């Protein structure tokens, strides 16, 4: 479903940071300022967000993987919830350096987590001493928190969706190194450099974060649904062709 200007206004997408903290590279997206707070031009944001959704839709239709990244307190739950709804991986606790550039190491940790989860399923905890079980539970909880969202990510993602590029500089840098497209919310205090699909907007408001994440998740689901419909229609077309020539 398309996001509207009214929804963006209600979510506070237009509220930037204090004028003294601004990044001049965001000047083209700033409408003005009020009470020393920069106001983002939603007439720029809305079409740019629509472009980002269009790209996401196409990527999802081609079975692409989009990694959701949002580790700030106000975005953690929403990022996990919307990524899961869209069937995509996510990082919402802390970005571990090398998550993409050193994927081999991440794969080792993922294997460890999956092995531990399998052990729990098999009832192995009951065979351990209290101390062993406690240490085991602590380790599995730590792994689930840090990499639980990426445990089913088979390889480097086809794109990453980031809320707050300043807070996730390492993630953006890793994506840039690997040539992975970056879709990101960029507030007035950060630079849009290194971002392929810039979404100028408030990156602190939980309502705004929910709007972005829901919009991206919706686009992914739409892209997948469109791809399925095309396959079904193509199959029907083949059937009709066969019937006509039977």
From Swiss-Prot:
Protein name (Swiss-Prot/TrEMBL): Small ribosomal subunit protein uS2
Record InterPro entries: Ribosomal_uS2 (IPR001865), Ribosomal_uS2_bac/mit/plastid (IPR005706), Ribosomal_uS2_CS (IPR018130), Ribosomal_uS2_flav_dom_sf (IPR023591)
Coiled-coil intervals: none
Gene designation: rpsB
Lineage: Bacteria, Pseudomonadati, Pseudomonadota, Betaproteobacteria, Burkholderiales
Pfam families: Ribosomal_S2
Keywords linked to the UniProt accession: Ribonucleoprotein, Ribosomal protein
GO cellular component terms given for this protein: cytosolic small ribosomal subunit
Presence of keyword Membrane: no
UniProt GO MF annotations: structural constituent of ribosome
NCBIfam families: rpsB_bact (TIGR01011)
HAMAP family the record matches: Ribosomal_uS2_B
Family: Belongs to the universal ribosomal protein uS2 family.
GO biological process: translation
């Amino acid at each position: 479903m398309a996001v509207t200007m009214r929804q963006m206004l209600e979510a506070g997408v237009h509220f930037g940071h204090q004028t003294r903290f601004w990044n001049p590279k965001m000047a083209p997206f700033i409408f003005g300022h009020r009470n020393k707070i920069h106001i983002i031009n939603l007439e720029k944001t809305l079409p740019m967000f629509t472009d980002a959704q269009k790209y996401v839709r196409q990527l999802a239709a081609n079975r692409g993987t989009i990694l959701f990244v949002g580790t700030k307190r106000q975005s953690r739950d929403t990022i996990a919830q919307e990524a899961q709804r869209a069937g995509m991986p996510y990082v919402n606790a802390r970005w571990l350096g090398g998550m993409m550039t050193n994927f081999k190491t991440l794969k080792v940790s993922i294997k460890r987590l999956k092995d531990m989860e399998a052990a729990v399923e098999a009832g192995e905890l009951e065979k351990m001493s209290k101390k062993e079980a406690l240490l085991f539970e602590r380790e599995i909880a730590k792994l689930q928190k840090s990499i639980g969202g990426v445990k089913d990510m088979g390889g480097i993602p086809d794109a990453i969706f980031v809320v707050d590029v300043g807070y996730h500089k390492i993630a953006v840098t890793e994506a840039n190194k690997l040539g992975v497209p970056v879709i990101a919310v960029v507030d007035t205090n950060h630079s849009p450099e290194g971002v392929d699909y810039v979404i100028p907007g408030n990156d602190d408001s939980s309502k705004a974060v929910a709007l972005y994440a829901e919009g991206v998740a919706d686009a992914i689901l739409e892209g997948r649904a469109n791809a399925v419909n095309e396959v079904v229609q193509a199959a029907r077309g083949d059937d009709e062709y066969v019937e006509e020539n039977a």
